[in-house]
């Protein structure tokens, strides 16, 4: 094989390996972010959950004090991922999650479906939520 062809082949191989590593890292961080978010929601840590929301989403859809106070009335009793899909070459993910919430003031449990849209932020090297916190006023 000609030395130039050999160098080009090695370069192409190196680029493919680096792209694969990058993709695997994004996949791994997606799983970690989803697990962290699920844990925070299961413990009804609504303020911590808000830290997962993308700043640009918050600018357009700020969380009101009323929204946070309403969420604080509820304790999560169940969090079940019903479907998940990845788009845009692994940079966007959507999850449909069934969340059961118990309101101690009313002694009532309700079930909501939370449609989550996540996008990988390459600058921050983390997954951010682009769909807001669960809405306890939605009925299943």
Regions found by a protein language model. Name each.
Residues 1-21:
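Sec-dependent bacterial lipoprotein signal peptides
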Residues 88-140:
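Exposed beta-sheet edge and beta->alpha loop/turn motif
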Residues 38-45, 53-57, 61, 101-103, ...:
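Sec/Tat-exported extracytoplasmic proteins
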Residues 15-17, 70-75, 123:
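Short, structurally constrained coil/turn elements
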Residues 19-43:
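Short, low-complexity N-terminal intrinsically disordered segments enriched in polar/charged residues
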């Amino acid at each position: 094989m000609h030395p130039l062809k050999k160098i080009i082949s090695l370069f192409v191989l190196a680029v493919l390996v680096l792209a694969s590593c990058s993709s695997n890292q994004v996949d791994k961080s997606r799983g970690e972010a989803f697990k962290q978010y699920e844990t925070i929601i299961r413990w009804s840590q609504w303020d911590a959950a808000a830290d997962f929301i993308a700043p640009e989403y918050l600018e357009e859809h700020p969380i009101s004090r009323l929204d946070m106070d309403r969420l604080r009335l509820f304790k999560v009793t169940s969090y079940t991922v019903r479907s998940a899909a990845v788009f845009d070459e692994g940079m966007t993910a959507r999850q449909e999650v069934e969340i059961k919430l118990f309101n101690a003031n009313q002694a009532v449990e309700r079930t909501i479906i939370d449609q989550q849209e996540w996008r990988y932020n390459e600058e921050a090297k983390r997954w951010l939520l682009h769909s807001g916190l669960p809405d306890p006023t939605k009925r299943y």
